[in-house]
Amino acid sequence: MALRFPRFSQGLAQDPTTRRIWFGIATAHDFESHDDITEERLYQNIFASHFGQLAIIFLWTSGNLFHVAWQGNFESWVKDPLHVRPIAHAIWDPHFGQPAVEAFTRGGAFGPVNISYSGVYQWWYTIGLRTNEDLYTGALFLLFLSAISLVAGWLHLQPKWKPSVSWFKNAESRLNHHLSGLFGVSSLAWTGHLVHVAIPGSRGEYVRWNNFLDVLPYPQGLTPLFTGQWNLYAQNPDSGSHLFGTSQGSGTAILTLLGGFHPQTQSLWLTDIAHHHLAIAFIFLVAGHMYRTNFGIGHSMKDLLEAHTPPGGRLGRGHKGLYDTINNSLHFQLGLALASLGVITSLVAQHMYSLPAYAFIAQDFTSQAALYTHHQYIAGFIMTGAFAHGAIFFIRDYNPEQNEDNVLARMLDHKEAIISHLSWASLFLGFHTLGLYVHNDVMLAFGTPEKQILIEPIFAQWIQSAHGKTSYGFDILLSSTNGPAFNAGRSIWLPGWLSAVNDNSNSLFLTIGPGDFLVHHAIALGLHTTTLILVKGALDARGSKLMPDKKDFGYSFPCDGPGRGGTCDISAWDAFYLAVFWMLNTIGWVTFYWHWKHITLWQGNVSQFNESSTYLMGWLRDYLWLNSSQLINGYNPFGMNSLSVWAWMFLFGHLVWATGFMFLISWRGYWQELIETLAWAHERTPLANLIRWRDKPVALSIVQARLVGLAHFSVGYIFTYAAFLIASTSGKFG
């Protein structure tokens, strides 16, 4: 008999019910649980799968370049970035009638197209690409990298090319190579690209392989580098009247510290960006030579951690035992990596709009909104994943003997204090913030808006003032016109920063008031509650007073049977599951706030946000309802328009979201009865009963139904808001 799916678990393969299929899919990537897995095969499988991941990423990015080159309007967009709509790709749909064809034929195209809201046009333009041929070249190169990645993945599964476990656990070598090779060399290479291709491109000089060695990016070449006159590279920067992509108003500097934004493109100065990447390259190239490998010099990670004992002896044994704990636990390493990546992704969201690096992207409002929202949601999923793998570490990999009285053990020892403090903070934030909002709602409902409780964010305004924002009148640090910091700032460092901070046309340090104070605390409530659920899930993963033997039941278990009351919903997986709802909720508030604040800024009516954001009805009526008008009227008996697809997606997103509750609210018994009735009917229906299946149909397990419900809730929620965001922004600003 042929091997049945799943081949990695013979026990599951022999299951006579449909559970075999769903559990097989659920555990396909849990290599640790597979039959006859060894530590060596585990590491090798994960290593090989990374190359597959890279191949997919390169193929996807290649596809972006290829479709824009083939079906887009990059060359005409380059000529007029502010008025031509960038096309992502063509749409072919047999359902389109003539009105639809006309509605979606935009951006100078000959047929229906999708408009690009990803910012890739601005990025490619900034880094020096100018023609469709450039895009095709990039697409081919990435396709080549994709093929190389696939070959590398296959190669590293062959016996002669499989790395050993000791190679995977050589932390110092990995750190050195990742710091120097991955970050250092790539940052240096990127600096080279910016200096040799992008900066000349921004000054109207087209540099490619055929003239790459003939065009000096700086008139004196490398002379200032070797003579120690590095400051020459910053002299004669582009002027404030520089027209991007032309020589008009351009300078010769390549590495500057101007600060602020290019007046025409509203993006960071390319020469500042090149300088930044050079500094990053230098730091990481040095950092990549810090750890001891073949030559007996440098730090040993183990020695560093063993030596890190807090003074006074009141904090236990510090980091003793951590090296082996981390180095032998893939879940711990993954948890750390996801936590770092999650924070970085959220920082990307914050900085892409406040300090835009790509030419003209600040004036593409829909892309700005889409990119912010996209990166915040991605960050949320990655961060919750960090805690999930932290909890799995505690269940599968944590060894109490190896970690006696170190920081990990002490976290577990103090978990009641940690969890109760987080609980207290969440309760305080929740009751006070909601109390203020509801009080203000009631005052408006009773016709006495002057009785609202409005709190000025004095401390936050003071911090903004310290960084140079003068409108609050604090006269402190950089906003004090006669202070030494202010005077130094005008000449020595970042002279453009102060003018940028005080220019109301960008998103740097937006003016804040009582509405911002309230929504910041609502977001703080969401962050603390999400953290509470995640931290509790990880710290209670091994056991709690209620269920001391919890670790023996694994990461995800529904309950310990009917005989032991109160053990349902307390697995570490359940904590992750609940936290994702809170995470989505919190990021909802974050993106609502960002979007509404910016819509009013871009429309020039900031008073609408300031007046309506201090009470809940204001958010519901003046943000959600008012901005959804295009979606609830996207197509009607009188015809359709280019927003119709978003109106349809808005409805579809609601449908997916609502379907989630079907899985979340009704449990297994209901579905089992329904399935058995349907199977009975199927077997007695002519023609239909010719189709048979081997597996007995059974309802999803409790945990699986929750996962399916959560997936529908998350996807539907994001689809719905994405449609709302893009339609409401593009409907106003194009």
Curated annotation (Swiss-Prot):
Cofactor binding: number and manner: P700 is a chlorophyll a/chlorophyll a' dimer, A0 is one or more chlorophyll a, A1 is one or both phylloquinones and FX is a shared 4Fe-4S iron-sulfur center.
GO cellular component, one term: chloroplast thylakoid membrane
InterPro entries in the cross-refs: PSI_PsaA/B (IPR001280), PSI_PsaA/B_CS (IPR020586), PSI_PsaA/B_sf (IPR036408), PSI_PsaB (IPR006244)
Gene3D superfamilies: Photosystem I PsaA/PsaB
Membrane topology category: Multi-pass membrane protein
Molecular function as annotated in GO: 4 iron, 4 sulfur cluster binding; chlorophyll binding; electron transfer activity; magnesium ion binding; oxidoreductase activity
Chain positions recorded as [4Fe-4S] cluster binding sites: 559, 568
Enzyme Commission number(s) of this protein: 1.97.1.12
Main location: plastid
Residues where chlorophyll a B1 binds: 654
Top-level taxon of origin: Eukaryota
Signal peptide, first to last residue: none
Example of a GO biological process term: photosynthesis
Catalytic activity: reduced [plastocyanin] + hnu + oxidized [2Fe-2S]-[ferredoxin] = oxidized [plastocyanin] + reduced [2Fe-2S]-[ferredoxin]
Family, similarity comment: Belongs to the PsaA/PsaB family.
Subunit structure, as described in the record: The PsaA/B heterodimer binds the P700 chlorophyll special pair and subsequent electron acceptors. PSI consists of a core antenna complex that captures photons, and an electron transfer chain that converts photonic excitation into a charge separation. The eukaryotic PSI reaction center is composed of at least 11 subunits.
Protein name: Photosystem I P700 chlorophyll a apoprotein A2
Organism, as annotated: Piper cenocladum (Ant piper)
Gene assigned in the entry: psaB
